[in-house]
């Protein structure tokens, strides 16, 4: 059974990690996938990889500035115009920082909030414009377990992810009247380039705090996105699902 057959789906941060895993799993399940990435070069590389894996599938790719509503709307609009609708929006793009509080500059904090919060807000806002008249759709926002429990360092990242959780719950309650569901996913420690780019001492701390004694794989998170985007999750909205292997920062 293809859980998202013919569902028009956009995945931000879709060129690597969780987003790229989601792109593959959604294609495997019949979705019409478009990916957003940070640069056109990254997008083109990911598109080439997907073309090799799925030569019969047409996957669109864009590199809009997620902090610009106009730029995001232009890209989202191209997808909706091509297919006549938008069914699923996965706001997955994000950045991290582990600077301790005393070393976080105003510019660094603002940048994290711009990408992780404003980017999600813009993605959700633009998706809503394409879904409201059809009165159906699913918006999935990537949060983090650190947005629930905090972290030992790097206040900007958990602050931004807590904001994503609040945005998700509030928006989910507001627009369910339009039959549009909004759900958050809060991953724990996932085996991605972003995670593995942390300093060795932070990676060591992660592994000690993992009851499963391993990091989660991107596909384990993407499978939850797949379920939430499907009709099997028709009663789930305005909440955040933790996929963390019992990890507590």
Curated annotation (Swiss-Prot):
The active site is at residues 157, 161. It holds the Pfam family adh_short. Keywords: Lipid metabolism, NAD, Oxidoreductase, Steroid metabolism. One of its GO terms (molecular function) is NAD+ binding. Substrate binds at residue 144. Induction: Induced by the C24 primary bile acids cholic acid (CA) and chenodeoxycholic acid (CDCA). Signal peptide: none annotated. SUPFAM superfamilies: NAD(P)-binding Rossmann-fold domains. NAD(+) binds at residues 15-18, 38, 42, 92, 161, 190-192. It is an enzyme of class 1 (oxidoreductase). The direction of reaction is pH dependent in vitro. At pH 7.3, clearly the reduction reaction is preferred with an order of magnitude higher velocity than the oxidation reaction. At pH 8.7, the velocities of the oxidation and reduction reaction are comparable. At pH 9.9 the velocity of the reduction reaction is about 60% of oxidation reaction. One of its GO terms (cellular component) is cytoplasm. Transmembrane segments: none annotated. It catalyses: a 3alpha-hydroxy bile acid CoA + NAD(+) = a 3-oxo bile acid CoA + NADH + H(+); choloyl-CoA + NAD(+) = 7alpha,12alpha-dihydroxy-3-oxochol-24-oyl-CoA + NADH + H(+); chenodeoxycholoyl-CoA + NAD(+) = 7alpha-hydroxy-3-oxochol-24-oyl-CoA + NADH + H(+); deoxycholoyl-CoA + NAD(+) = 12alpha-hydroxy-3-oxocholan-24-oyl-CoA + NADH + H(+). Its EC number is 1.1.1.395. PANTHER family: 3-OXOACYL-(ACYL-CARRIER-PROTEIN) REDUCTASE (PTHR42879), 3-OXOACYL-[ACYL-CARRIER-PROTEIN] REDUCTASE FABG (PTHR42879:SF2). There are three genes for BaiA proteins: baiA1 is identical to baiA3 and encodes a polypeptide sharing 92% identity with baiA2 gene product. Homotetramer. Involved in the multi-step bile acid 7alpha-dehydroxylation pathway that transforms primary bile acids to secondary bile acids in the human gut. Catalyzes the oxidation of C3-hydroxyl group of CoA conjugated bile acids generating a C3-oxo bile acid intermediate. Can use choloyl-CoA, chenodeoxycholoyl-CoA, deoxycholoyl-CoA, and lithocholoyl-CoA as substrates with similar efficiency. Highly prefers NAD over NADP as cosubstrate. Also catalyzes the reverse reactions; in vitro, the preferred direction of reaction depends on the pH. This is 3alpha-hydroxy bile acid-CoA-ester 3-dehydrogenase 2. It comes from Clostridium scindens (strain JCM 10418 / VPI 12708). The lineage of its organism: Bacteria, Bacillati, Bacillota, Clostridia, Lachnospirales. The gene is baiA2.
